[in-house]
Structures are given as C-alpha cells and as structure tokens.
C-alpha cells in the first residue's frame, strides 16, 4: 500500500471519515469539507446487537451520523465489521480475562478494525485517506518510507495517542485527524454553531459492546464464575470473590470486605491475583507498598516506526490512559521490552498496555505481562537474559 503521505490539493483528495454518531467525528467531517476535501462518511457496525439486550445504541448513533452527514451535505456509507471485531478483538478480550488479565479492547479494535478493516474497505471505495475523530495528530516522515509519526493531540485532557499506539506508521500516514489540532470545548462550539444534533451528545465511555451494562454482568454471559478466597498477604482469609476476571489491580470498589473490625477502617485494594490458587490478594491503604511496581516486562511491542529507537533508551511512558508521563529506561529483550521506572508506579496491571513517548511523539507500546516491586526478584525471564548478558 504505497501512498504519498503528504495530501495533494484538497479538491483532488478523497477522504472517508469514520462517523460514529458522536460530536468529534461530526466536526472532523465538517472541518475536512470546509477545507475543500472530497468528503464522504462511513458508519461502522462493529457489534451484533441481536443479543436480546437493550444496551446497544447503534441505531441511535447511525441516525445521528446520518443527520450530521445530511447537514454537511455528504454521503454516508454503512459497513459491518462485526465478524472482524469478533475474530480479532472480542475473542482475544475473553481469552485475556479468562487468564486473569485485564485487557484493553479499544487498543486492539483500533489496530484491527478502525485502522485495518475500515481503511482497507475505504480504499475499495476510492479513498485516498480515511479520517477519524481521535484527539491525536500525525506528521509525515517524507523519507520515502510512506510512514508518519503519531503525535499527541493538542488537548492534553483528551489526547488519545495511547489508544492508537499499535497502529503502524504506514496506516497512520493514510489517516487524517482534524480534531487533534483542537481542544474539546472548541469542537463542541463548532458543532453547536453548525447546528449538529451531536453538539451536546455525551462522550461515549467504556467499551462499545458493553454500553451501560454493569461490567461483571456482561462478562458473566461469556465466562463462568470461578469463586475463590480473598486473602491478606499473610494468608488470612477475609472474604470471597466470584472470579479473578472481575477484578483489576488497584481496584477498591466491589470487594465486599468492609466492616472487618479487627482490621480497622482503612479501605481495601486489590494488590495481586494468585492465578494458581485462584486467590485475590488485598491490602489496606491506597499507598500500600504492594500496590507499587518498580518495573515491568511487556510482550511484543508495536513500534509505530516499525522498530525501536535503540536497544536501550530513556523515554517517558504511560501504563494507563490519562496518566502523566513517567520517566523510565527501556531495554529491548527477546519478545518484548523491560521497563524500569525512575519512580515506583501504582497499580500497574498485566493485560493493560505500556506506551512510550519522546516529547510529543508516540513511539509505540506493548501489553504488560509481568511486574516487579522494589526489593523483589526480577522475573525469571529477565534473570535468564541478565545471566546471558553478564558474559559480555
């Protein structure tokens, strides 16, 4: 898929905008049309609603997207990527939860559906580029590689580069991000000024296929409960859980272990999952040492540029969305990276992603597999590599 990463004149450039029925993609489409591009919209259906529930909002979202397309004066296509979503995203989502990890399906959805299935389909419709309403930016490399850098959005409160880190530089180069140059209040102002029905629409939260449902209720439809004990680090049983998959590291709510007089009033937090024993380890106090990790090991890393900047380098990282950038040292190892943070990090969660930055440039990221604390032995995987490296 070779393509000049610098758009030709807008009048000769055809862009298909992924329109979700939300305010951000509405304004993205309007901005491009206002700039003179040949613009069409496409509404993606990524989840099969025929599951007997009332929680999906696809029909309402489609109606809103159509109303905005009509207001702008552009054609709106519709396409179903539900099969791709199930095969490439949802089955992995269930597999990770059943293994006791906490995945982020939005990241995989962007990689496999929004910037793969959608982009490939848009090309068949004659698109030169796609566009989305993500708060991020891209910068063509202009080095003949056909790639672009992924940059943070200008609005620090809305920057979504964390969720797009797994998209390749080639596909980033084929995408325009009009609202990445704006702050959210300005986007809403434009939508209201244009009379879009989406101007005051609530931002979507959570995972698209769950909607407003309680997460545990949704998960129970697909994964059977596996009850077990909740214990303190010294092995004292203080409660029961219905399944490790329903809990995440650092979680406070939903443990059902309040009112234990002998332990005082400090709240309890999930510190660890003992997968072999099916035990949830809980500690008291938001700043308990067992909630903090000095480092982590990731699985394979998706580098936006296709390769890491070096075998060992310093940069900043996030282990969750909207976390302030954290200083760290990254070492490339077999099958992933080792990350050592300058400051211990709270509630680093296997299954979530660690994403790397140098300035405004998002380098890429990978899924967190293991963590270790201060004064704790390195994971065996790292000890093995360290012993091999000591001979050099």
UniProtKB/Swiss-Prot annotation:
Region (Interaction with tRNA), start-end ranges = 158-160, 320-321
Q: Which domain of life is it from?
A: Bacteria
> Where is region (Interaction with target base in tRNA) located?
104-106
SUPFAM superfamilies reported in the protein's UniProt record: Adenine nucleotide alpha hydrolases-like
| Gene3D superfamilies xrefs | Adenine nucleotide alpha hydrolases-like domains (2.30.30.280), HUPs (3.40.50.620), Translation factors (2.40.30.10)
- Cite a GO CC annotation: cytoplasm
The GO terms describing molecular function are: ATP binding; tRNA binding; tRNA-uridine 2-sulfurtransferase activity
Pfam families (UniProt xref): tRNA_Me_trans (PF03054), tRNA_Me_trans_C (PF20258), tRNA_Me_trans_M (PF20259)
Q: Which cysteines are joined by disulfide bonds?
A: 109-208
Protein name, entry field: tRNA-specific 2-thiouridylase MnmA
Q: Where does ATP bind?
A: 18-25, 44, 133
- Tell me where the signal peptide lies: none
Family (UniProt): Belongs to the MnmA/TRMU family.
Q: Which reaction does it catalyse?
A: S-sulfanyl-L-cysteinyl-[protein] + uridine(34) in tRNA + AH2 + ATP = 2-thiouridine(34) in tRNA + L-cysteinyl-[protein] + A + AMP + diphosphate + H(+)
Enumerate the subcellular locations listed in this protein's record, separating them with semicolons.
Answer: Cytoplasm
Site annotation Interaction with tRNA: residues:
134, 352
Q: What class of enzyme is it?
A: transferase
EC number, UniProt record? 2.8.1.13
- List the active site: 109 (nucleophile), 208 (cysteine persulfide intermediate)
- Biological process annotations from GO: tRNA wobble position uridine thiolation
> Keywords of this protein's UniProt record, alphabetized?
ATP-binding, Cytoplasm, Disulfide bond, Nucleotide-binding, RNA-binding, Transferase, tRNA processing, tRNA-binding
Record's function text: Catalyzes the 2-thiolation of uridine at the wobble position (U34) of tRNA, leading to the formation of s(2)U34.
């Amino acid at each position: 898929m070779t393509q000049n990463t610098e758009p030709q004149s807008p009048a000769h450039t055809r862009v298909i905008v992924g329109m979700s029925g939300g305010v951000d993609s509405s304004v993205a489409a309007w901005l491009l049309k206002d700039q003179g591009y040949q613009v069409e919209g496409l509404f993606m259906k990524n989840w099969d609603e025929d599951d007997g529930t009332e929680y999906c909002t696809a029909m309402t979202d489609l109606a809103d997207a159509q109303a905005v397309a009509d207001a702008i004066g552009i054609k709106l296509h519709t396409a179903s990527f539900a099969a791709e979503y199930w095969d490439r995203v949802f089955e992995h989502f269930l597999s990770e939860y059943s293994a006791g990890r906490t995945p982020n399906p939005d990241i995989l959805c962007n990689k496999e559906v929004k910037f793969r299935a959608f982009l490939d389909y848009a090309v068949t419709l004659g698109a030169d580029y796609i566009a989305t309403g993500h708060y991020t930016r891209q910068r063509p490399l202009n080095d003949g590689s056909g790639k672009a850098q992924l940059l943070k959005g200008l609005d620090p409160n809305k920057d979504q580069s964390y969720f797009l880190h797994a998209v390749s530089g080639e596909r980033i180069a084929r995408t325009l991000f009009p609202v990445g140059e704006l702050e959210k209040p300005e986007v809403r102002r434009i939508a209201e000024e244009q009379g879009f029905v989406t101007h005051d629409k609530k931002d979507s939260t959570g995972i698209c296929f769950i909607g407003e449902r309680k997460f545990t209720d949704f998960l129970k439809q697909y994964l059977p409960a596996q009850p077990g004990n909740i214990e303190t680090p010294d092995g004292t049983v203080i409660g029961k859980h219905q399944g490790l998959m329903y809990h995440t590291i650092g979680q406070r709510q939903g443990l059902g272990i309040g009112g234990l007089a002998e332990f005082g009033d400090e709240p309890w937090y999930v510190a660890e999952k003992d997968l072999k024993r099916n035990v949830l380890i809980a500690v008291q106090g938001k700043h308990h040492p067992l909630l903090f990790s000095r480092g982590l090991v990731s699985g394979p890393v998706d580098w936006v540029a296709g390769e890491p900047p070096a075998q060992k380098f310093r940069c900043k990282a996030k282990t969750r969305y909207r976390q302030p950038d954290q200083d760290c040292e990254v070492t490339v190892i077999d099958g992933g990276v080792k990350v050592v943070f300058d400051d211990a990090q709270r509630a680093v969660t296997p299954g979530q992603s660690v994403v790397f930055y140098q300035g405004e440039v998002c380098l890429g990221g990978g899924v967190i597999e293991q963590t270790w604390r201060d004064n704790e032995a390195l994971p065996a995987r790292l000890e093995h590599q360290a012993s091999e490296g000591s001979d050099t």
